[in-house]
Amino acid sequence: SFQLAAAHRLARDLIDAAKRIGEVPDPMWLDVEKRLPLYTADYSGIMLFKGQRFVESHRHHSHMAGLYPFDTIDFSDPKTLRTVEMTYRNWTRMGMGLWSGWCVPWASIPHTHIGNAPAAVFMLHAWDTFFTNPGYGSRHDVYNQGLSIMRRGTNSGRFTVAGDAPGEEIMQMDGMCA
């Protein structure tokens, strides 16, 4: 569904650009908008691609690219709205246990798009609490346990306390930029 959303965003932008400069849009761009589906979906919501359901909430939310960043999904259609609702419910049900740091602020955006401001704000606070180090640097691995298992030292099954996992040191080398 990511590629479908990207193709639609590109086609729409090319059509719009052509009109703005007084050109006729390429028929291929119009054909993409006419015949290419916006996404693939089943009863569970938007799928990763045709035949592949979203079965594990991991480090990216690309199956929802039609919501963000491409903004190609129109909520005014009741069937589409139901699909988005099922997608959101399924994504929420899967949880954040396999998420990495950079996808947490990204998750704030779909919450914003559907009007769930408290969840959007929570994601930003969660990112700050669990995925930034004491110097406020963003991390891939969780800095504090309890939200995700994406942590060096714990993914191998060894439970660690804060500061105990390998690679948790904070250092700066002269001449190196952050």
Give residue spans per PLM region.
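Active-site core of glycosidic bond-cleaving carbohydrate-active enzymes
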Residues: 2-177
